[in-house]
A protein has these predicted regions:
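A short, structured loop/turn motif at beta-sheet edges
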Residues: 23, 120-123
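Hydrophobic residues in well-ordered beta-strands that form the structural core
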Residues: 1-2, 154
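A structure-centric signal for secondary-structure junctions around beta-strands
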Residues: 26, 81, 114, 139-140
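Arginine residue identity/basic-tract feature
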Residues: 49, 57, 77-80, 120, ...
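NAD(P)-dinucleotide binding in Rossmann-like oxidoreductases
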Residues: 106-112, 122-174
Length: 174
């Protein structure tokens, strides 16, 4: 895997838990790249990042969210992505930033402020991937796993929720 987010401790721990069956059948995974870049826009060489968002539409940085999600769903290891629907909002903050910096009115800004992509796999599982670098949302990669028997979430706090299991009273010491 070339995506660095698959190597974070929480992602690796959750992947191991999923592979061990702790969450039961994994049904849905979420991931994203949400990062308010307002303070960083001037730092990008030749304004490359804003320029790319102005000229291209869609989730232009899907790998942070998709890498860990694909690992948990066993994409290309028994399952594959089959159906994809992606939508974005209108562009508000990108054109406003350019106008503030240059005085230039931008009418053809391509990428919306928020892009959401929903993917269904061959085996009937779903994945939601989001991209948002234009609004004041706090940083998040939204990593979430929804299983038949458990749940994991990394942002805004790391948490696990597992279905309680029935324990035979003879196995529990008093």
């Amino acid at each position: 895997q070339l995506e660095n987010c698959v190597y974070d401790f929480f992602e690796l721990t959750s992947l191991n838990m999923a592979q061990q069956g702790v969450f039961g059948d994994v049904l849905h995974v979420e991931g994203s790249y949400i990062h308010n870049l307002e303070d960083f826009w001037p730092s990008y060489w030749n304004n490359w990042r804003m320029d790319y968002n102005q000229k291209h539409r869609g989730d232009v940085y899907a790998t942070h969210g998709m890498g860990p999600a694909c690992q948990v769903l066993n994409i290309h290891r028994g399952d594959r992505m089959k159906t994809l629907v992606s939508m974005d909002t209108k562009a508000v903050n990108g054109p406003a930033y350019i106008k503030k910096q240059t005085g230039e009115e931008v009418k053809d800004f391509q990428n919306g402020d928020q892009t959401s992509t929903l993917i269904r796999t061959e085996n009937g599982k779903t994945m939601l991937i989001q991209h948002n670098v234009m609004t004041p949302r706090p940083y998040s990669r939204m990593y979430q796993i929804v299983g038949a028997d458990g749940y994991a979430s990394k942002y805004p706090i790391e948490e696990y929720c597992l279905r309680p299991t029935q324990v035979d009273s003879n196995d529990v010491p008093n």
